[in-house]
Amino acid sequence: MDRKLLRLYQPLNAYSYNSDSLFLYDFSRPFIKNSGAILDIGSGCGVLGLLCARDNPLAIVHLVEKDSKMAFCSQKNALKFPNTQVFESDFLDFNPQILYDAIVCNPPFYALGSIKSKNKGHARHQSELDFASLVAKVKKCLKPKGYFIFCYEALSLCLVIESLKSTKLTLETLRFVQSFKDKNAHLMLGAARNNSKSALKVLPPLITHHSKNQSDNTKEVLNIYQICNTYSIKAFLN
């Protein structure tokens, strides 16, 4: 497939999407390819949801984002995709009129209290939205056999499994992300399915770098960047 360049406007001096979102999108592709309806939670500038929309033009793709500036960027970036709709809303207050085949989410928080972004307007942490609350709401928005595809810090694996189990979402596929072969995993990529009894499949880890040189990416990572084919444009918003 010839994937067109996805141009993404982002607010200047605000939290920007990073490689986590691109790794998550690549991981999600087998689970969303036949989806009729997809939801991107906490869409930010729209990178995840719009990649889904670009590569699945027959799917209905909804994006929900509570920050007004980021929601504006999602709306701006989504103009070329008639199969998308952006909602400015806190996900916990979001009441969609449909159920989704797949829900994707790169939560902008970490369970253990560390903060992804130093920008106060976009830094969130466990006290604002814990993973258990997120999953409970996801459950209500999924079709009976729908998928929840997400990334999270690897240290919180036990919390993730417990939260999913409490809502009868089964973690079916798991992949860890490591900076180097000899380093511990820092990120997990997970696909959980509603009302599933399947055994867990753990995929080989995604190794991101050959060396400490940030541009010395592995072949798989370079391939992911090529598949996603995104370009960021920083914009000043009042």
Predicted regions and their residues:
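Mobile active-site "lid"/loop adjacent to the S-adenosyl-L-methionine
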Residues: 107-133
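Conserved SAM/SAH cofactor-binding pocket of Class I
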Residues: 26-96, 102-105, 111-113
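Conserved Class I SAM-dependent methyltransferase catalytic core
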Residues: 7-9, 13, 130-185, 189-190
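S-adenosyl-L-methionine
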Residues: 1-32
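Short amphipathic alpha-helical segments
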Residues: 75-76, 115-117, 161-164
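SAM/dcSAM-binding transferase cores
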Residues: 184-238
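Residue-level signal for inorganic ion chemistry
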Residues: 24, 106, 134, 192
